[in-house]
């Protein structure tokens, strides 16, 4: 096995130099982040990719635990931040025991992964082909490399460092938090919660997607969660005679920032109407158990403003609580 250390160092330095122009590095192993105030953040790396390359990266990362939870917009930011690195056959890309924070996706070529145990000879444990990846633990942990990776053939890789990965997650988290806080401010039943509680709820909202024609909530069913529309639209229908579909009529149509089902945080009443997705719809949801864990029972919170509490508590069960209530 050839050990072309100088080439390996130059390639690694190329990746780190391009990323470090955009990210302030702290001491090794520390997580760097931008201030959460209004100061503009330093731009992330933005390296255009061909459609074919983007598709290969998408396929490579779709089943990777470090990326599978990201939404499409977040993955696209990751793709743009990845830097091209070239290695010759025989080059050592990663050396077991070394520190490193680079994650790689193979665009072309083959790599071999070796592990030495108890000071013994290196053992080939895996072959990684085009579309494969390695080094993902370096994105979040500062621990030494667990294996050695050697290029069997000339390889073309796309690399991402841990600081960039964490920065992307931080930027997206802050962006979502601000958006969700704005949504929550419009929910009448939550209007009187304080800033800390609103931030906690914004962080607790879970994304959920629905396809065209999919029923999100059904009239008469029990419910324990409420929804805010992030993207797309839904139609709200109600049966004048519950169970008689012929009496169903449209109550309203809801759009991004509208919400429905908020009374589920307060009572166990059956759903008063049916909500159906029109086209693809992206929502965020919050259930009563998660709400109570973060903020305590909502009835106690509403008692801060008895007028609001009585308004929701005394609402007739037949009154749909699924229409938007923008302030």
UniProtKB/Swiss-Prot annotation:
Superkingdom to which the source organism belongs: Eukaryota
Binding site for 3',5'-cyclic AMP 1: 66-188
GO biological process, one term: regulation of protein kinase A signaling
Disrupted gene: phenotype observed: AcaA and pkaR double mutant shows no abolition of the ability to sporulate.
A cellular-component GO term for this protein: cAMP-dependent protein kinase complex
Short motif (Pseudophosphorylation motif): ranges: 27-31
InterPro entries membership: cAMP-dep_PK_reg_su-like (IPR050503), cAMP_dep_PK_reg_su (IPR012198), cNMP-bd_CS (IPR018488), cNMP-bd_dom (IPR000595), cNMP-bd_dom_sf (IPR018490), RmlC-like_jellyroll (IPR014710)
Family matches, as Pfam families: cNMP_binding (PF00027)
Maturation and modification: The pseudophosphorylation site binds to the substrate-binding region of the catalytic chain but is not phosphorylated. The physiological significance of phosphorylations by other kinases is unclear.
Region of interest (Dimerization and phosphorylation), residue spans: 1-65
Keywords: cAMP, cAMP-binding, Nucleotide-binding, Phosphoprotein, Repeat
Region (Disordered): 1-47
Residue numbers bearing the Phosphoserine modification: 32
Annotated positions binding 3',5'-cyclic AMP 2: 189-327
Sequence similarity: Belongs to the cAMP-dependent kinase regulatory chain family.
Domain notes: Lacks the N-terminal domain required for the association of regulatory subunits into dimers in other eukaryotes.
Extra information: In D.discoideum each R subunit carries only 1 high-affinity cAMP binding site (2 in other eukaryotes).
Quaternary assembly: In Dictyostelium the holoenzyme is a dimer composed of a regulatory (R) and a catalytic (C) subunit. In the presence of cAMP it dissociates into the active C subunit and an R monomer. In other eukaryotes the holoenzyme is a tetramer composed of 2 regulatory (R) and 2 catalytic (C) subunits. In the presence of cAMP it dissociates into active monomeric C subunits and an R dimer.
Name of the protein this chain belongs to: cAMP-dependent protein kinase regulatory subunit
């Amino acid at each position: 096995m050839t050990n072309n250390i100088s080439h390996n160092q130059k390639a690694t330095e190329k990746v780190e130099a391009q990323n470090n122009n955009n990210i302030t590095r702290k001491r090794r192993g520390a997580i760097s982040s931008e201030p959460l105030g209004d100061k503009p953040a330093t731009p992330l790396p933005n390296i255009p990719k061909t459609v074919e390359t983007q598709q290969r990266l998408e396929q490579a990362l779709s089943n990777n635990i470090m990326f599978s939870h990201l939404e499409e917009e977040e993955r696209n930011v990751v793709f743009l931040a990845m830097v091209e690195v070239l290695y010759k056959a025989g080059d050592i890309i990663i050396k077991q025991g070394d520190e490193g924070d680079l994650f790689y996706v193979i665009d072309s070529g083959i790599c071999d992964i070796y592990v030495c145990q108890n000071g013994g000879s290196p053992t080939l444990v895996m072959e990684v082909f085009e579309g494969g990846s390695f080094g993902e633990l370096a994105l979040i942990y500062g621990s030494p490399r667990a294996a050695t990776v050697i290029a069997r053939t000339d390889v073309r890789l796309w690399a991402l460092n841990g600081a960039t990965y964490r920065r992307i997650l931080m930027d997206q988290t802050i962006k979502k938090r601000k958006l969700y806080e704005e949504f929550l401010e419009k929910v009448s039943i939550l209007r009187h919660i304080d800033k800390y509680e609103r931030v906690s709820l914004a962080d607790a909202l879970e994304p959920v997607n629905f396809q065209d024609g999919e029923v999100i909530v059904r009239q008469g069913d029990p419910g324990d969660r409420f929804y805010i529309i992030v993207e797309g639209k839904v139609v709200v229908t109600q049966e004048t005679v519950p169970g008689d579909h012929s009496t169903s009529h449209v109550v309203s149509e809801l759009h991004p920032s509208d919400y429905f089902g908020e009374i589920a945080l307060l009572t166990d009443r059956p759903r008063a109407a049916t909500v159906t997705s029109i086209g693809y719809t992206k929502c965020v949801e919050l259930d009563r158990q998660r709400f109570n864990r973060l903020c305590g029972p909502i009835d106690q919170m509403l008692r801060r403003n008895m007028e609001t509490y009585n308004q929701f508590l005394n609402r007739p069960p037949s009154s749909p609580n699924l229409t938007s209530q923008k302030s």
